[in-house]
């Protein structure tokens, strides 16, 4: 009897499970245009007033008791879809901005809570870029610029007019570039020609300044998302922004692109392969040849890129898997040389050769059915570079010049350089990077609302295996510079570990929707001496975004939505290898400089000090952001506006640090040149011991960058009668640059044949505010019947302004020649020596400099031929301009711009 009861219970339980399974529906929601999953879409079953379920991070949802009923699927930025509930169905949502197949040639604001712009392939093709730098024109606040490929191109997000010096380069260093999930690391880049003072060499340096955008080709890119706001805690080692690049995959087309403009020529070739078993392979190469002036063949820049990308997808009833493997080569080559006919037959050159080899792979697996575990992703990436910078100069000296190569503290006689020689200095750098990352996503199945929990960790290693500076110390390229050799491979590797967690919630409240994304990231540097501050703790980054979507409204039978969003968060960028381990400074002080008409009797004696330039108190740069935004959609029209503020008070900068150094001043007046048979001996030669202040450069957290502004974008739907859409975007930026730590300054005044022996310590030495406002009006027309598309863009720069803030003329304290620090007292300005520490900045130094309105008109056109296999495109920037003259004080400033145009040919077979 008991067995029968147990059997009946099991039978009834099984039947209930079967009935429940039959009433449970699992389906997929994707974008109709891109076939990408829609995450967080709400599903409402007929008869219910609130959402029954939300799609997960794979775009899937599961609902019960809905068989045969209608369901309504809705998501911000897409048209509502009402359809019959069916198991294993795929529902496609149509964007309210663009119809299927419609060409969008401008950047679009992302649907995410943080401020971000998405640039699709169509927009890049219409823009006709030569490098990634050209894409920044599409951002709010962006403007077209002539390509400048003879120097590194750094990214500066949300800045008005950045200073040209490197003291505020943390903004570009702190912008992370991620290509197919793998970050591009520049932390081991130490490719700097030491001692160089010529613009020819220094203008091509990119140490501690982030990614050089010239090196990134755009032809393989399928989509770019540039996050200016608060990114996910998944991404770290950044302060200013995030650039996520996704490259093309699949297809079977053979593509070729040829482009020529006023400064460069570009060739691109790519072939895609796609097999039935879901394997894909993409091969591509591109070559760019640029000249700053086409008439000058002595200054060139070349870029070569080769890429092989493979992938495969697997699917079963429970999971969807995706594997990707990328192999990449990138070469970047700068070259400048002088004309021997203008240099007395001597050729002078400067060359750089950057060769980057990269491999990356990723594997992801996602659950199709709803449950606690949703997805897992693992990424492994590595890159290796072989970089050289080489300078050759013909040296002509006018006087006896010493060369010192003592590697330790002490006294020595200098080698006397010949008056004429040819010298070469080379930098050998071999940066290596290894990156690993794992992510796991969980979701708590709760009826009526969507949630996901992201847990992850990443590890990053950077090291440079190069030889460093290679030169002949007795034939220096830059005489009178205290230069020594150091092998870069002897510097320890940087190891950074981070772990993070982030919760994402979408919750319906009445007919509203609340979105919350909050997380925390902890990062720490390892393999570093415990005496360094950065080795003692984890640095937390807390980031939070929230959005509130109001109920859908209806005006004139048209529907619209309004969303308000808010974001706040901190962002951390760790110091680079060059900043943590700067090479020693060498101070060579001349003690005796005896000249004799006979070269064999000359003698220069020097005192050498080896100066440790390491700053163990150096901390990561940290940026605190907040932003408020609104996004309004109505009948295909969209308006978004963002108010933001960013305050980074601990940016990296190089500061002078003074200390006293003693040396001997020999009195050579008693030497009888007529009795010498050898260089004069120092024994018995009278001397005076002198103490003097000398400086060494040290990296500190002394730069503050304050960004404030408004960004906005308005786009219309395409007006069918004229086939035209209007896009208006622009920004107002106000940026303040100043030092956030005290600065030491030694006046150049001379008293009694000596430079002033005191150093003033000032609370401020650099306070500059820049401002700009612009608006771009773009009308793009697409006529499918004629296979013709063109756009006209009126780029209005309403004004730019800069103003230095008042600086303190009187120091807070000062250092005497012995190294003692004294507080500044009232009346010190009357002291015969100390009065030279009082700076004299007149009011004109602080005048606001305003450049008034200017307008550029740009034109682009594309024409498809031969059944879309051939595409001819042309652009002309500054086709027409309005740049009136203006006055700055009493000075008349005349402005003039030149058009810049180009033509390209695209073939698809």
Language model features: what each stretch is:
Residues 510-511, 665-808:
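Gram-negative outer-membrane beta-barrel transporters
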Residues 91-92, 203-255:
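A beta-strand signature from Gram-negative outer-membrane beta-barrel systems
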Residues 42-60, 103-130, 152-156, 192-206, ...:
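N-terminal periplasmic "start-of-domain" segments of outer-membrane beta-barrel proteins
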Residues 7, 648-650, 654-656, 796-839, ...:
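C-terminal beta-signal and adjacent terminal beta-strands/loops
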Residues 133, 137-195:
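Extracytoplasmic beta-strand/coil segments of soluble accessory domains associated
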Residues 28-34, 41-46, 72-78, 86-126:
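Short, acidic, small-residue-rich periplasmic hinge/interaction motif at the N-terminus
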Residues 490-638, 642-647:
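Structural signature of Gram-negative outer-membrane beta-barrels, strongest in the C-terminal barrel
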Residues 314-332, 352-531, 537-541, 552-554, ...:
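Face-selective signature of the C-terminal outer-membrane beta-barrel domain
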């Amino acid at each position: 009897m008991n067995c029968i009861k147990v059997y009946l219970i099991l039978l009834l339980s099984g039947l209930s499970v079967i009935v429940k399974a039959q009433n449970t529906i699992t389906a997929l929601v994707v974008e109709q245009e891109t076939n990408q999953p829609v995450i967080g879409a709400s599903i409402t079953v007929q008869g219910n007033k609130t959402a029954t379920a939300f799609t997960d991070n794979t775009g899937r949802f599961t609902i019960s008791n809905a068989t045969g009923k209608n369901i309504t699927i809705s998501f911000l930025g897409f048209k509502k879809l009402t359809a019959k509930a069916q198991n294993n169905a795929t529902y496609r949502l149509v964007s309210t901005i663009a119809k299927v197949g419609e060409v969008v040639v401008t950047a679009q604001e992302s649907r995410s809570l943080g401020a971000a712009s998405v640039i699709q392939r169509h927009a890049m093709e219409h823009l006709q870029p030569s490098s990634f730098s050209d894409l920044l024109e599409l951002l709010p606040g962006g403007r077209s610029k002539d390509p400048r490929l003879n120097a590194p191109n750094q990214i500066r997000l949300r800045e008005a007019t950045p200073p040209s010096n490197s003291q505020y380069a943390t903004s570009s260093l702190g912008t992370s570039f991620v290509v197919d999930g793998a970050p591009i690391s520049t932390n081991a880049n130490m490719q700097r020609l030491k001692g160089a003072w010529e613009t020819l060499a220094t203008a091509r340096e990119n140490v501690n300044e982030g990614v050089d955008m010239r090196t990134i080709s755009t032809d393989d890119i399928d989509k770019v998302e540039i996050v200016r706001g608060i990114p996910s805690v998944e991404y770290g080692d950044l302060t200013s922004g995030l650039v996520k690049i996704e490259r093309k995959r699949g297809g079977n087309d053979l593509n070729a692109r040829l482009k020529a403009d006023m400064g460069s020529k570009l060739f691109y070739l790519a072939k895609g392969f796609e097999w039935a078993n879901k394997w894909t392979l993409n091969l591509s190469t591109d070559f760019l040849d640029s000249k700053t002036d086409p008439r000058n063949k002595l200054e060139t820049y070349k870029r070569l890129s080769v890429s092989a990308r493979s992938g495969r997808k697997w699917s079963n009833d429970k999971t969807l898997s995706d594997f990707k493997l990328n192999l990449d080569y990138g070469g970047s080559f700068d070259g400048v040389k002088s004309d021997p006919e203008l240099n007395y037959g001597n050729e002078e050159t400067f060359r750089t050769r950057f060769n980057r080899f990269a491999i990356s792979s990723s594997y992801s697996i996602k659950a199709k059915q709803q449950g606690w575990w949703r997805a897992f992703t693992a990424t492994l990436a590595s890159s290796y570079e072989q970089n050289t910078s080489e300078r050759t100069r013909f040296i002509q000296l006018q006087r006896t010049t010493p060369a010192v190569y003592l590697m330790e503290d002490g006294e020595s006689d200098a080698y006397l350089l010949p008056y004429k020689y040819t010298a070469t200095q080379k930098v050998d750098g071999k940066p290596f990077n290894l990156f690993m990352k794992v992510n796991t996503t969980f979701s708590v199945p709760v009826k009526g609302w969507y949630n996901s929990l992201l847990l992850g960790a990443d590890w990053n290693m950077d090291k440079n295996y190069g030889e460093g500076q290679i030169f002949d110390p007795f034939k220096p390229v830059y005489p009178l510079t205290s230069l020594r050799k150091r092998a870069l491979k002897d510097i320890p590797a940087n190891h950074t570990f981070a772990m993070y967690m982030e919760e994402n919630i979408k919750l319906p409240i009445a007919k509203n929707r609340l979105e919350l994304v909050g997380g925390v990231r902890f990062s720490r540097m390892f393999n570093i001496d415990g005496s360094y501050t950065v080795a003692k703790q984890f640095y937390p980054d807390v980031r939070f975004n929230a959005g509130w979507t109001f109920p859908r409204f209806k005006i004139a039978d048209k529907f619209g939505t309004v969303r308000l969003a808010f974001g706040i968060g901190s962002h951390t960028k760790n110091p680079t290898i060059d900043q943590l381990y700067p090479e020693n400074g060498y101070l060579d002080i001349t003690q005796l400089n005896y000249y004799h008409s006979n070269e064999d009797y000359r003698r220069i004696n020097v005192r050498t000090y080896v100066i440790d330039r390491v700053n163990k108190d150096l901390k990561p740069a940290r940026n605190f952001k907040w932003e408020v935004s609104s996004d309004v959609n109505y009948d295909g029209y969209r308006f978004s506006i963002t108010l933001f503020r960013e305050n980074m008070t601990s940016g990296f900068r190089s500061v002078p640090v003074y200390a006293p150094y003693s040396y001997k001043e020999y009195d050579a007046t008693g030497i009888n040149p007529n009795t010498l048979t050898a260089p004069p001996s120092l024994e018995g030669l009278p001397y005076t011991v002198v103490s003097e202040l000398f400086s060494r450069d040290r990296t500190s957290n002394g730069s503050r960058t304050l960004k404030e502004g408004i960004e906005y974008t308005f786009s219309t739907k395409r007006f069918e009668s004229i086939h035209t859409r209007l896009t208006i975007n622009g920004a107002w930026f106000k940026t303040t640059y100043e030092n956030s730590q005290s600065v030491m300054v030694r006046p150049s005044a001379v008293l009694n044949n000596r430079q002033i022996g005191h150093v003033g310590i000032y609370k401020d030495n650099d306070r500059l505010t820049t401002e700009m406002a612009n608006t771009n009006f773009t009308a793009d027309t697409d006529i499918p019947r004629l296979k013709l598309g063109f756009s006209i863009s009126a780029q209005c720069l309403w004004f730019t302004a800069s103003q230095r803030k008042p600086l303190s003329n009187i120091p807070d304290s000062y250092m005497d020649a012995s190294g003692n620090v004294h507080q500044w007292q009232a009346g010190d300005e009357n002291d015969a020596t100390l009065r030279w520490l009082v700076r004299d900045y007149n009011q004109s130094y602080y005048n606001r400099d305003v450049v008034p309105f200017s307008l550029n008109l740009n034109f682009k056109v594309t024409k498809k031929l031969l059944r879309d296999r051939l595409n001819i495109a042309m652009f002309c920037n500054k086709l027409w301009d309005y740049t009136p003259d203006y006055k700055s004080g009493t000075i008349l400033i005349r402005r003039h711009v030149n058009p810049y145009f180009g033509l390209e040919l695209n073939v698809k077979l």
